[in-house]
Structure formats: C-alpha cells, structure tokens
Amino acid sequence: YCGFLMPKICLIRPSIVVPAKNTTTMFTPPLGLAYVAGALRNSGFDVQFIDAVGESLDTRHPSDFDCYLYGLSPSQTVDRIRSDTEIIGVGFGFSFEWPTCRDLVEAIRDRFPSALLLGGGEHVTAVPEQTMKESALDIGILGEGEETAVEIAKGYASGRLEYKNIPGITYLDTHGEVIINERRARKRDIDEIIWPAWDLMPIENYLERGYGFGVNRGRSMPVMASRGCPYQCTFCSNPAMWTTRWIPRDPDLLLDEMQFYQKNYGAENFDFYDLTAIVKKSWIINFCNKIEEREMKFTWQLPSGTRTEAIDGEVARLLFKSGCRNMSYSPESGSHGVLKRIKKKIHPGSVINSIHSATLNGMNIKCNIIFGFPGETLKEIFESYLFIIKMALAGAFDISIWA
C-alpha cells in the first residue's frame, strides 16, 4: 500500500455491565479483538487498542437496572482515542452488552463525526438489522473478523471502499435500509491467523491478578486451539457466528504460541477459549503427547463447556498428565425431552460416565445446567434436579445453574 496514507485505527473493548448482586466478578482479556488487532498491524496499520475493562479493572460506575459498569466510563474511553484516528472498531460481544456498546458508539460519533465506525462480535452477527438500525455504526462485521477488518481498512486507505463488494458485513444504504452482504467464507487454515496483539493492551493487569476464563491458577493467558463447533444447539450463537465447521490448529504451532507466552509473559496457566476444544479424540491425544515431548510445564483448563464424548479414562489420564486440571461440561439438562428440543445430542448417562472417568484421574469437573427452556415442564425440571445430584455423586465439584 505504498503511496497511500495509512489511516490510524483504534479498536475498543467496552466496559462491562455486571449486576450489583453478583458475588464474584472476574474479567477476561479480549481474545477476539486482540486477534483483529494482530491482523491489522500485520497488514501495516497503526493500531491503538483501548481495553476499557483492563485499563481500570478495579473501577466501577453506577449503571441502569441495578447494575455496575466496570472499567472506564464512556467519556474516559472516548478521551483515550487519538485525535487523528480515522477508523474506530468496537467489540460488541454478547447481547447483554448491547446497551453499553450502543451508548459508547454514540459518544464516539459525537466526538469523531467523520470517523468510520465498525462493530463486530456475537450480537452484531446474531441481530444485524437491530444493530444497524439502533446504533451509529457505519459497518457491522459478521462472524470471523480478521480478514474483513483488514479488507475494510485497505479499501479505506486506497480511497476505494465499496461496501457492496465486501463479504461478511452489514450496513445501511442511502435509503436507510439494512443491507446484509453474503457471508465471508470461514478461514480453513487457522494456523495462518496472526497471533493476538497482546502487547497493545494492558495484559499485565489481568496476569498479576490471575484473571481468566477458568479457575485462578496464577498468571493465565487465553489461547484458542480450534474455531467453530459442529453441533447446533438451538440456544447457542455459534452457528451464526462461526458456522458448524470445527477447525483445529496444528498442535505444534499452538504449543509454539504457548511457549512464547511462557517466555515473554511468564504464563503459568492457559485458559482455552474454544467453543468445543475436544471433538476428535485423536487430536487431543496428539496435543497431550506433544506437551510431554517438549517437556513443557504449565497447567491448562477447558472452561467453556467441553463435550464429553471423547473423554474416557485414557484421555482423562493424558489430560491430567499434560497439566490439564479443570474442565467444564455443559449438558444443560437432565431431561431427554429438553435435550432433544434443544438439539444437544448427548445422553445424560454418557455425561455421568465421563465425569466419573475424569474425576478418577484427578480432573476437577464443573457442570452447567439451564432452567427455563421454552416449553420446559415441571417434570423435566425435576429430571434435571435428579441429574444434578447424579453429577455431584459422580464427582463434579461445581455445578452452575443458569436461568
């Protein structure tokens, strides 16, 4: 892009709304946005990264609906944006963050009326029409964001940014109608994706507190061993965000990244942010064996809701030997009727067997159960209560109830 004036870019992870009655609050580094920052910087752009949570982890502000806003206030966040910034991207995360993100975008638009405003994440992807109609965004990025963000930035830099020609975005046309372009194809070789640009954000603030997605086991870095999930649970945003293609990384290249974090950030533990890290038994066995071959020493966790099918006694022994200490299972319900309606594709009995095998081999197992699915009967709720007791007897040390 020699000859073009490269625009300055700012990526923002907004503050987070937390109910006032929450007894525990632990925040995680923004992995998705860090990947986008890495891709943009690798393409030659000058990227500023504002992590409104990480820059002020111990600060909270009163918010609506008996909640607190943790991190920088919207005005503090906007004040940190460089005055000559031309492209500003906001990570929207999930729908509970929508009001906060929308208000932040409005504040940015007031201060930077001519900037190109981008938004991406689960909420934008799931409800693009609402996002574009109710916010000041110019472009919403759908699904995997690295390639789309780079294409937008390059088009802007060249002066030839044509919204209609960019796959994987949504925007308003000249009549105020929402346009949703054809989705961008998933990247098949995810080992080509540039590592997250953690050096652009205050990662040390998380590390020194042991903050992460899983149990506090010291200085924890987030990593992703795969993208996507082959399952189609009806309540999950995965099919819209990532599609149902599960793509794993090369274990050696993943371990290269983890070794880099050990050397440069003093990482002691790794939290895997995968939607479904263990799909193929052969992959996880290979990964565990590679850790042993390299004689790497660390703990690692699978905190996001692991499938149980591939975890038997053999795999559980390898997991523990390689340093894995905590896993989360997400059976969601103990009722066959509910499981069928939500397309969970698991059997409660297999979950119990997997918990038993894992705990016998030293693993700490947490389980997630959801009450309140549409059409759920009292009988089905009772079945889930019985299932909770069975999981506890099988060895689960923590069971989270969601409603």
Name every feature range the model reports, one short phrase each.
Residues 39-189:
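Glycine-rich beta-alpha loop elements in corrinoid/cobalamin-binding modules
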Residues 191, 196-366, 371-373:
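Radical SAM [4Fe-4S] cluster-binding motif and immediate context
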Residues 1-5:
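Short, Lys/Arg-enriched N-terminal segments with co-localized hydrophobic residues
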Residues 9, 15-24, 166, 172-222:
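N-terminal [4Fe-4S]-dependent radical SAM core
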Residues 27-41:
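Short catalytic helix/loop segments, enriched in acidic residues and glycine
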Residues 128-133, 315, 375-390:
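Catalytic cores of alpha/beta
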Residues 18, 56-58, 128, 231, ...:
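Flexible glycine/acidic-rich beta-alpha junction loops that bind and position SAM and/or redox cofactors
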Residues 7, 111-116, 137, 298, ...:
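A short helix->loop->beta-strand "cap" motif at the edges of active sites that frequently abuts
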